[in-house]
Every structure is written in structure tokens, then in C-alpha cells.
Amino acid sequence: MPPPASSVDFSNLLNPQSNPTESTPSSPATPVDSSKGPSTPSSAQSTSSMASSVSLLPPLMKGSRPATEEVRQDLPRPYKCPLCDRAFHRLEHQTRHIRTHTGEKPHACQFPGCTKRFSRSDELTRHSRIHNNPNSRRSNKAQHLAAAAAAAAGQENAMPNNAGALMPPPSKPMTRSAPVSQVGSPDISPPHSFSNYANHMRSNLGPYARNTERASSGMDINLLATAASQVERDDHFSFHAGPRNHHLFSSSRHHGSGRLPSLSAYAITHNMSRSHSHEEDDSYSHRVKRSRPNSPNSTAPSSPTFSHDLLSPTPDHTPLATPAHSPRLRPLGSSDLHLPSIRHLSLHHTPALAPMEPQPEGPSYYSPSQSHGPSITDIMSKPDGTQRKLPVPQVPKVAVQDMLNPGSGFSSVTSSTANSVAGGDLADRAF
């Protein structure tokens, strides 16, 4: 029969010590079944050679496990759970089981910014591999969260409070059964998370890092006002300031936030707006003084806003006697008369500035009707270079004989003028 022949060949391959002439190799297979255990009683009862040969594999794979379980069942279980009826061989197993009832998780992850805790040390070990593997997607997400939390923790631990005492360390117990991660300050990150460390340091060194993080936590409302005013000043300064008008703009940037519509309006409300600017500076400096000495705002270089009194070309005690180079006010009316005629007319034709020009309080010290010749401004404004010459002084036309004869009817003023013009020694030569 072909099937028994194939079964005999297969049994010979599995059991080379058996006699190949035997037609029923079930006899060597039955001791194996009986020795391995009672898990496969059907193989011992089977009379088919194919079934007996194939049934050799399951006892080899399954026979050892029930034996070990029986051995473990025989061990004593002295450690019983007080909350349930379970008992354990070792004290560690009982302690780990009791934590499932109480919810205690003493094993905390020491990675900067990670707040997870575990009741078993092997769970903490498995969790720490997430931080140690930079290629994991969970690791990347956890690193971003850890960087933000580490920055906040570093801010709170690095800065002292207003009383001068250091803040207490975070209340995390350091007791754990497996030394997996580093124990130390949250500012120190492991070498594998250099990007987190760089982000953390960058957020610490940034001038507004404390304002944004502390404002998000809602601890101090004054920090919101400080950050808002600082951002507004910086935005306005970056829009208007340049290398050419940095000196001029630093003196007038207090009024550049859209509060005053025009320069002429500022000319009328000059004293009032300047007093408001000082009140604004005082309130802002008061908020700065209330902040901690280690804050980035107090250590940052001072902006041109705070050098208002030093860089201002116009002193505060002379609001009406503004010099001509001041960027805040236009020159007074008396100085406008020195301008050329076309510029003089263009200034007075401006409808918005004409009624708002400040007028001098005292009498005019200069009258254009007193000048008979061309002014210096007219000479310098001529396009032709040959015409830019000073005129020759107009000397009274007096003949030499009249100058030599003082008694010919000239007055003393004329003779004195002639003597001064001619040199004063012509009369002496004549006599």
C-alpha cells in the first residue's frame, strides 16, 4: 500500500534509530507520548502510523510548559494581598500588586519636561526608550512637549522671587527602583536631545520669553501690559527708524503711535503731550522696576526711548524758543522770512498748517522791508554759479575835491563816513 510506505519513510526520518522493517512505528512513539505528559492522549490511542508520526511534534513543543507551571504552583505563596485573595511568591510582586489597588505611581520619568509616572519600574524603563530613540514619531512629539515644559520649568527654577530667596525645587520624588534617566536640574538635557537643549536656551535668552510664558500661565497681569507696550514700540521703531533719521526719530517716537494726527497739532499741544510722555515713561519705568532683576527686560540694552532727555535737541524748559534744527516744531514765524520767496509761499499755502503755526510772543526783531539789497538766501538760490557773488558795498559817491575840502557843505556824518572809507589820512595829506 502506498500510504503505509510513505508513512514509514517519514517516521524513519524523524526516528532514525527505529527498525525500518517494522510496518507500525507506533511502538517507539508511544513511550515518547507517555513520557512527555498527558497532554496528547489521542496519539497513544491511535493505531494509524501516519497519525502517530505526525503527533510527535505537539508533545515536544507543549510538554515542557505544563511541567513548569506545576512546579510554580507548588511554590509557597507567603505574601498575600490585604485587599484581595491573591498571594505571591515574592515581596516585590505583592508590592507591585497593591499599587494597582491604591493607584500609587512612585516611578517618575526624569526626562526634562516629561510628567509621566509609573507604578512599575519596568514600565518606566520601557517608557524611557521613547526619549532615547530620536527616530520615533512619538519621540519627536514628546520632545516638542518636553522642550516647552523644560523651558517653563527652567524659568521658574532659575529666577529668584521678589524676597531674594530661591524658589524650591519641583516636588517630584526621586525614589525609584531602576536608575534609567538622569537625575538633575531640568535645565540639563541628555546629549541625545541637543535640539531640545538649544530650543530651551534660545527661549531663555530671548528678550520676551519670560513675558510670553509667564503671561500664558496667568501669574502677573502687569507682564501683559509690559509685553504689549514693548512690542508696540519695537514695531513702530522698526517701521520708521533708519541710519539717517535715528537721532531725530529717537526724540519723537513717544508720539508716533497714531495719537497725534500731524506735526502742527503737536505744535499747539506741545506742553501737554510732553507732560503725558513723561507720565508714560514714569509708569513704564515703574513696571520695569517691579520686575525681577534677572529678567531679560532689565538686562536687555536700552532702546532709544529711554534716552529721551539725552538725545532730545529741544530742552523741556524752553517749549516756545524751539531751535531751527528741532524735528518736533517748525521754525518760528520770524525765521520763516529768511527763506526764499517760493518756499515761503508754499509753506503758507498749506491749508492744514497755516492756522496752526505758532506765533512769536514778543515783537519781531527783523523786518524784511529794512533790507534794500538782495539777501544771502536769494544769492545762494540762484541757479547760475556766476551770479552767486556778494554785492559790492555801496559807498556814497563823493568827489575827491569834496572830500579834500571839508568845509564845502558836507555834514559831519558825511565827512566821518568819507574819512572811514578813504582811509582817514587823505585830509592829512592835503594840509
Swiss-Prot record:
Chain spans, region Disordered: 1-74, 272-337, 352-431
GO MF terms held by the record: RNA polymerase II cis-regulatory region sequence-specific DNA binding; zinc ion binding
Q: Which domain of life is it from?
A: Eukaryota
Ordered alphabetically, the record's keywords are: DNA-binding, Metal-binding, Nucleus, Repeat, Repressor, Transcription, Transcription regulation, Ubl conjugation, Zinc, Zinc-finger
Naming one, the record's GO cellular component terms include:
cytoplasm
Task: Tell me which InterPro entries the record gives.
Answer: creA/MIG_C2H2-ZnF, Znf_C2H2_sf, Znf_C2H2_type
Q: Where is the composition biased (Basic and acidic residues)?
A: 276-285
* First and last residues of each zinc finger (C2H2-type): 79-101, 107-131
Subunit relationships: Interacts with creB.
Q: What is this protein's record name?
A: DNA-binding protein creA
